[in-house]
Every structure is written in C-alpha cells, then in structure tokens.
Amino acid sequence: MIRDLTRFNLGRFLFDRRRASGAPIWSALLIVALLVAGPTPVLAVTPPDPVLEWIGIMNTTVLAGGTNPLVSTRVVALVSASVFDAVNGIEPRFQPLHVKPAAPHHASQRAAAIQAAYVILVDLYPAQTATLTAHLNTSLAALASTEKAQSIAAGVAWGQTVADAIWAWRLTDGIAPPPPPFLGVQSIVGTQAAIGAWRPTPQGLPNQLPGVSGAGPQFATMTPWVLTRPSQFRLPPPLALNSPEYATELDELFKMGVYSGSGRTQDQSDLALFWAGNTALYWNRIASQLSAERGLSFTENAHLFALMNVSMADAAIACWDGKYRYVFWRPITAIRDGFTPADSDPTWIPWLDFFPGGTPAHPEYPSGHSTVSGAAAFTLAAAFGENAAFTIDSETLPGKIRSFASFTDATTEIANARVFGGIHFRTSCVRGNMLGRSVADYVSRHALRAKGDDGNGDEE
C-alpha cells in the first residue's frame, strides 16, 4: 500500500503524498505552475481528456512491461475501475463499482482520474515509476490553466484514496500466491496424458523446446469483479473426439493452420499474426478511436472504459474456468498424437509457432482471445452501435492497419486468425465469443448502472 511520507504546501492546501519508491508525485516545477495559476483559471485552454490520455499511457506501460494478455485483463480493469470510481465519486452519476462517493465537492474530477491511473500503474510497474511520474506531472500541469490549485490537490488526494482502496480490494482476488505448476493429467497420475487432454506443448522454433506448465491456473478460481462465480456462464464440453464436427475442424486446422504448405492466402497468414498480440490492448485502442470520433466527454469515457475493461476481466476469469475444467488439448497435440494413428502427423507445426508466443501455454477450450474480444465487442456495440466502423493496428505486425465495418466483422476475423494460426479449433472461438458476450451483458445489467437504474432484474 502507498503511504504519505512527504508534505507539499500548494498555496493554502496541505497535501501529503510521496510514492513508496521515494519519487515525489508532483515536481517542484509543477507546484510552481499551480501556484502561478492562482485562485482562478488564467487561460481558457481545455486540457486533454485524462481518461483517453491515461488509457494510452496504460497501453504503452503494459507493452513495455511485457505483460501477457491474460494478466493484462486484470491490469486494465484495475486502472479503469480506479479511474471510474474516482471520477464518479466527485459527481455521482452511476452506481460505484467499489468505492462509495465521499470526495470533497470542489475536488477536480480530471485530477482524480489522472492520479488514480498513475497510482495503479506504479503499483503494478514500479520499474517504470520515473516515466510514469513524468507523465503525471505533464498531465497535472495541463490542468493548472483551467482549474484552481486547491481543486486539483483535492482531486489528487481523492484519486489516491480510491486507487488505494481498489488495489487493496483486488489484492485478495486470488492472483497470489500462485498455485503449483499445472502439467495436465500427467501431473496427477504420473503417466502419459489421456487422449484429448491438454499437456505442455512444444515452445519456440526452430528446435521446438519442451513445453512449460499451464499459464494462469489461479484465474480459473479468481474472485470475479461482477460475476457471482467463475463458472456462472460455463460452456458445455468441447466437441467429442469421435464426432463429425470435430473431424471437420481438425481437418481445417491440419490444412489451414500449418506453417508450410497450407491453403492460406497471404492475407490469412497476415491476419493470424496481426491478432497474435495483447487482446485487451487492441480493444482499448479501438474504444479510444471511437470515443474520440464520437466526441464522448471524459466522464462518459470513464464509465465506458470501466465497463469494457471490467467485462473483459470477468470474461477472462470465466474463460479460464472453462480451460481448467475441460483441460482440452491444443491442435499441435491433437494432430501430432492423433485420436487414432491414422490421424497423426508428428511433424505438424502451427503457423504461429514460428513467431514469439506461438501456441499459448494453457488448455485450448475456450479461446481466450475470442472470449475477451466478445466481451469488449458487446460493450462497444452497446455504446456505439453494432455497425461502427473502425481501424486498428497491431504490435505483432507493425505498420499494418486492418479496417472493419462492424464489431461482428472483427470478432469473426479474430476467430479465423486463431484457426489460421494453428492454435485453436473453430468451436473454441465461436463459443468463446458467445461466452464473452454473455459475461458483458451480465456486467452491463448489474454494475456501473445509472443512479436509480437497478438493471431490471437479478437473474444470472
């Protein structure tokens, strides 16, 4: 937890705040700027939207920290939930997620949002404190021309309070301590894993290193943000190995997901790589673009990003419940080992295994990318309409831009990308998308509702 160690005097407002690292939150230059601003604004220059600004900073910080897509769903929810409760706590328009409104009436909402985002990011990425503090000082300095120093300081204090409360709340969500390594059925019986069961998959090319233990098993039992339990929307089991549907999907993977000699077009190969990045960050960039185009206010953005990112976090938890309930094998295992000897090809390698990340190190069903994307798409369609057009870039295929005429177009392409990458069966993607949408629908009806709106029911 962050505690006050150093006192700053901003005019007549005493404000205590220093990070645990020892780096002061407000630099001397910023303090001077606030004091010069005086009791009234001196310029009518609207500062940048602090929500969009710090969503961008969050995205950059997550990438710089090398955070994997699963853990990133928790990161973006922590940041957005803190920002929302900080903003909403000053002028309540919605039900709070966790922190009840108790801010001074004169506190700056913008300063509260900035501080809340900063606190969470420094808690999560202490190695980036210097960079984040520079962003903080720039953001707060931009407020000095339009808001009173006392209002800014009160907003910062409230933002800190909210972020500390959200941080303490989620420290007990089950993220730590990590459970023992999960190696599939082998870890339980000490023998060869059963047909159809996940086991560690080869990692890295050209030499296909031994597999690693399953990633994030604690997410399968993590306390959700809004859902009543991880299994609330648990999917039915994956396709039976002796079903014609499974045979069709296995054949599709064998032909379309292989690294060499596949039936893919160049565009299909590209889109598999394009969507191999961090799911939560794709959708935060999409939401930022649409928000800017539609002219949402920063308070509307605080609500939108909290709703989307909390939905994605709960979708990830629901997805991991399914992964570690069914423990279904990855295509590389299914094709190399085979349901029968006639089905097997021990030389088969997925297309994405030629790139960093490759086959994800956790059970196959359902698809995490599709589940989280389904949640985001549902939330954004409710805000902007299903047929909102947008473009998106990718950290895994720099310089490329893909365009979409609807959210369904995007989630359909994401499903194709996982199949063409050779890492998911199609049913896993289709059902994962449905799971994510179910989670987001529930979150939208049971959390962050407008004041006086009970969500029209308590059903699950």
Language-model segments: residues:
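Sec/Tat signal peptide C-region and signal peptidase I cleavage site
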Residues: 40-44
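Acidic/polar surface patches and capping/hinge elements
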Residues: 45-458
